[in-house]
Amino acid sequence: MDQKRLTHLRQLEAESIHIIREVAAEFSNPVMMYSIGKDSSVMLHLARKAFYPGTLPFPLLHVDTGWKFREMYEFRDRTAKAYGCELLVHKNPEGVAMGINPFVHGSGKHTDIMKTEGLKQALNKYGFDAAFGGARRDEEKSRAKERIYSFRDRFHRWDPKNQRPELWHNYNGQINKGESIRVFPLSNWTELDIWQYIYLENIDIVPLYLAAERPVLERDGMLMMIDDDRIDLQPGEEIKNQMVRFRTLGCWPLTGAVESNAQTLPEIIEEMLVSTTSERQGRVIDRDQAGSMELKKRQGYF
């Protein structure tokens, strides 16, 4: 294929499909992480293209914290059914028994137990040797220096000082028993690329990405959308209906909305063209401490 004759989106598409096929051919038990967000939707679309007209040769895995938006759960189940995907859902049973709650225990402990430990449990349970993730290098500085094939030791830990060279699109997937590789096919995409590709390919997304009038309250400098009744209002707090949308999706108490009137994909793309902030500014878990994402990845987080 002559890369010079492709548009930049088609070049990114071709690179991602190549990576996905490489992993399917090289590893014995791969899995695709499915977090239900826009990046997961693009990655799933690319995987379906990679093996069309066949079915995916690996399952989808959702590590459930119990605190995702209701619209996300509905979208997850509807998508898996529509595409005939095998969907594995894992929730940390110890965390459930402990009643881990982001309001009570804080974002750090909630993320560590329900996400990081939950993910490691699922990978160990099913014996996956490679796991696709939708992370991109433009999102956050620790992700910017991570390889497409990200080596993890038998404890699922990432060592940024022990990364493998990736020259001329050659990826080293050699691992010993118990070790694994996290694979990021969207590493070279930007947030704008993602939205332009979603528009180009007419990819279905969670409606929360589009602006609508939603019940929110302001807490700690973040617009929190109230998705159910598991919240205690603090003195002086008031729930108001505002036109908001989400640039990134996660657990609803830990994911901030942004004021917006962008109700269509072209309007979102217009916003992205003038945006000067990262989409992850709305993630509470990224504010825990300096270098918090790198620390989480060292501990086994995606």
Swiss-Prot record:
Gene3D superfamilies named among the record's database cross-references: HUPs (3.40.50.620)
MF annotations from Gene Ontology: ATP binding; sulfate adenylyltransferase (ATP) activity
Uppermost EC category: transferase
UniProt organism field: Enterobacter sp. (strain 638)
UniProt pathway: Sulfur metabolism; hydrogen sulfide biosynthesis; sulfite from sulfate: step 1/3
Record's subunit section: Heterodimer composed of CysD, the smaller subunit, and CysN.
Catalytic activity reported: sulfate + ATP + H(+) = adenosine 5'-phosphosulfate + diphosphate
Enzyme nomenclature, EC number: 2.7.7.4
Functional summary from the UniProt entry: With CysN forms the ATP sulfurylase (ATPS) that catalyzes the adenylation of sulfate producing adenosine 5'-phosphosulfate (APS) and diphosphate, the first enzymatic step in sulfur assimilation pathway. APS synthesis involves the formation of a high-energy phosphoric-sulfuric acid anhydride bond driven by GTP hydrolysis by CysN coupled to ATP hydrolysis by CysD.
Biological process, per Gene Ontology: hydrogen sulfide biosynthetic process; sulfate assimilation
Top-level taxon: Bacteria
Keyword Transferase listed: yes
Pfam families noted in UniProt: PAPS_reduct (PF01507)
Protein name: Sulfate adenylyltransferase subunit 2
UniProt record similarity statement: Belongs to the PAPS reductase family. CysD subfamily.
Alphabetized HAMAP family for the sequence: Sulf_adenylyltr_sub2 (MF_00064)
Keywords: ATP-binding, Nucleotide-binding, Nucleotidyltransferase, Transferase
